[in-house]
Swiss-Prot record:
It comes from Buchnera aphidicola subsp. Acyrthosiphon pisum (strain APS). Pfam families: Flg_bb_rod, Flg_bbr_C, LlgE_F_G_D1. InterPro entries: Flag_bb_rod_N, Flagellar_basal_body_rod_CS, Flagellar_FlgE/F/G, Flg_bb/hook_C_dom, FlgE/F/G-like, LlgE_F_G-like_D1. This is Flagellar basal-body rod protein FlgF. Its main location: other. It is found in: Bacterial flagellum basal body.
Length: 244
């Protein structure tokens, strides 16, 4: 039954991957069942532990020409505040301006680098490669650029992150990570963004479909085996009752 449950868990993850195949910046998730050997050779020494991993390779880049679309390069992440007010990280650079003139990504407020970003009306917005946001105005035949704020860009390795159901990434609750990172991750000057482009989901549709079909067949076999075991147990009980 453990194997069947693991297959169901795999199917759930694959279904989520396929559901997000068109989600900007989505990162493919997969799961492995790892054999855990007890060196002391005690009872129940061999147990399978499931481990979740993320494919953080970049998706295909799509040119949009939109000033509020960003491609976050390398191991950089955009910082947002989720609906619970918690700091989270994303590769989705499709920014929008809400009714309060704040930048959002999928209704999550974008966090500024030591600043509160409010976008003025009737301006041309420009985001530089270092995350600085400027307004561009034409005054008396002269182009005037004014700094509005700066995006908080962070540099985090994939092993320090875990993805939530909302699609956002968070720091793992791990002692080693807490030693390496403080409660608030600092802005990194190394990270660069490119305006006018978006990173597509990196989900491999054909691979996930093949795995889904394979898992479905394995699950069917597991159910047949469980059914056969139940039948054998029932026959054995009947024989015992007859002999008694």
């Amino acid at each position: 039954m453990i194997a069947a449950n693991q297959l169901l868990e795999k199917q759930s993850i694959i279904s989520n991957n396929l559901a997000n195949i068109s989600t900007t910046g989505f990162k493919e998730k997969f799961i492995f069942a790892i054999q855990n050997h007890n060196v002391k050779n005690l009872y129940n020494s061999d147990k399978k532990i499931t481990k979740e991993y993320y494919n953080l390779s970049p998706g295909i880049l799509r040119y949009t020409g939109r000033n509020l679309d960003l491609f976050i390069k390398d191991d950089g992440w955009l910082t947002v505040k989720d609906t619970n007010g918690q700091e989270a990280y994303t590769k989705n650079g499709h920014l929008k301006i809400n009714s309060k003139r704040k930048l959002t990504i999928q209704d999550n407020e974008v966090i500024g680098n030591n600043c509160n970003i409010i976008i003025p009306k009737n301006i041309i917005l420009k985001i530089l490669s270092n995350g600085v946001i400027t307004s561009v105005k034409n005054k008396h035949k002269h182009i005037v650029e004014t700094k509005i704020g700066s995006l908080k860009l962070v540099q985090l390795p994939s092993q320090d992150l875990i993805q939530n159901e909302n699609g956002l990434f968070y720091l793992k609750k791990n002692n080693e990570i807490n030693k390496k990172h403080t409660n608030t991750i600092k802005h990194s000057k190394k990270i660069r963004v490119q305006s006018g482009m978006l990173e597509e989901s990196n989900v491999n549709a054909s691979k996930n479909m093949i795995e889904m079909i394979s898992n479905a067949r394995q699950f069917e076999m597991q159910m047949k085996m469980i059914s056969m075991c139940d039948q054998n147990a029932e026959y054995a009980n009947q024989l015992i009752n007859i002999n008694n």
